[in-house]
Amino acid sequence: MPTLSVFTDVPMAQKLEGSLLKTYKQDDNPNKMFLAYKVCMTSKGRPWVSSVVRKTRMQIAQDPSLNYEYTPVMGMKSFVQASLNLLFGKNSQVIVENRAGGVQTVGDSGAFQLGAQFLKSWCQSSQIVYIVSSQKEPHGLIFQDMGFTVYEHTFWDSAHLCLDPNMLLDVVKHAPHGCVFVIGSMGNCQLTPSQWTQLMTLMKSKEIFPFFDIPYQGLSTGDLEEDARFLHYFVSQGFEFFCSQSLSKNFGIYDEGVGTLVVVTLDNQLLLRVLSQLMNFARALWLNPPTTGARIITSVLCNPAMQGEWRQSLEGVVENVMMTKEKVKEKLRLLGTPGSWDHITEQKGSHSYLGLNSQQVEYLISEKHIYIPKNGRINFTCINSYNIDYITSSINEAVCFTKDSER
């Protein structure tokens, strides 16, 4: 008699967005392209890595003085401090007053896992989470698995082809008292001074707890300080918050999964208490975070010359993205593609919306073998001199073929 498996009743999981990459890999068309990679790509179609990171990795590997003992539960102290200085500035108010701290995590997903665990245990009145970003984020799954009620909103206005701050403000207006707000892509959402004031006032009056997501610092504008400037607004207004800080993408060490859960409190005593609880959760989640990526980043950030070289490499990536967007827009103009394409260059960062509807996206995938997400948000570093003509002509074809549909 056959033995029944304990896994008999386990169903196949629902397909996620990652299945797009699987479909792409199964496609045997020689012209196929994938424009949704999360990492920055070079002009030759390889993942981008800063040259100073390559050199630093080699130096660390050849350093006989280094040991490979377990990392402390809270992570490398020098790495966490360097990460905080990068985010807020070494002489910022929150650093000087010892109101900011952090825990080294396994990438941004680890930061959200750790933060969600804390909120579930110690902020039981905040069991509703709003995730507001320029795109659909995977963090909702983490909060859902923790038992939170999750609502996801985007402030991309597909009708007017822009990121609309009023959509963000509207979500805050209708959010319940005491909820958690996971906010990403703030650098892309151009709020006026009056809108900033309105946002702060609304969040304070409703006692909303902000949980920021900063995965691409320096890769939005090319200016590290500018990309994190919005955090200073919240600090200056006396907000307490969490922040998921990923350093994998802007250093080009995607396989290392290097991140920090940043904590800002009203005073140092509160910070120490929060960090003590986070340490207990981290001990249960992963105990000891990985070392190599943290060592690379600390070495670069703590050496002025190396940090300067790294900053220049970020500026180079952003400049290339801006030029690529300009070329795409110009080629679409020369092709006579219907509609305005100014929204392409008005968006910041490597990941931006093309402004295509679902029918046009499906046409690109099925007819042209160009794989992009349903929302039409692509990685512009995937476009280079070898494929730009095919991509723009395919976009033109998709728009013209479906010209009776609204973008």
UniProtKB/Swiss-Prot annotation:
Reaction catalyzed:
L-aspartate + 2-oxoglutarate = oxaloacetate + L-glutamate
The entry's localization annotation reads: Cytoplasm
- Any single GO CC term annotated in Swiss-Prot or TrEMBL for this entry: cytosol
- E.C. numbers: 2.6.1.1
Q: Name one GO molecular function term.
A: L-aspartate:2-oxoglutarate aminotransferase activity
Keyword Transferase on this protein? yes
- Mainly localized where? cytoplasm
Is Amino-acid biosynthesis found in the keyword set?
Answer: no
Which co-factors does it depend on? Answer: pyridoxal 5'-phosphate
Residues annotated as carrying N6-(pyridoxal phosphate)lysine in the record are K249
* Example GO biological process: aspartate biosynthetic process
Mind listing the UniProt keywords for this protein, alphabetically?
A: Aminotransferase, Cytoplasm, Pyridoxal phosphate, Transferase
Q: What else is known?
A: In eukaryotes there are cytoplasmic, mitochondrial and chloroplastic isozymes.
Family named by the database record: Belongs to the class-I pyridoxal-phosphate-dependent aminotransferase family.
Q: Which PANTHER family match?
A: ASPARTATE AMINOTRANSFERASE (PTHR11879), ASPARTATE AMINOTRANSFERASE, CYTOPLASMIC 2-RELATED (PTHR11879:SF6)
Q: What name does the UniProt record give this protein?
A: Putative aspartate aminotransferase, cytoplasmic 2
Species of origin reads Bos taurus
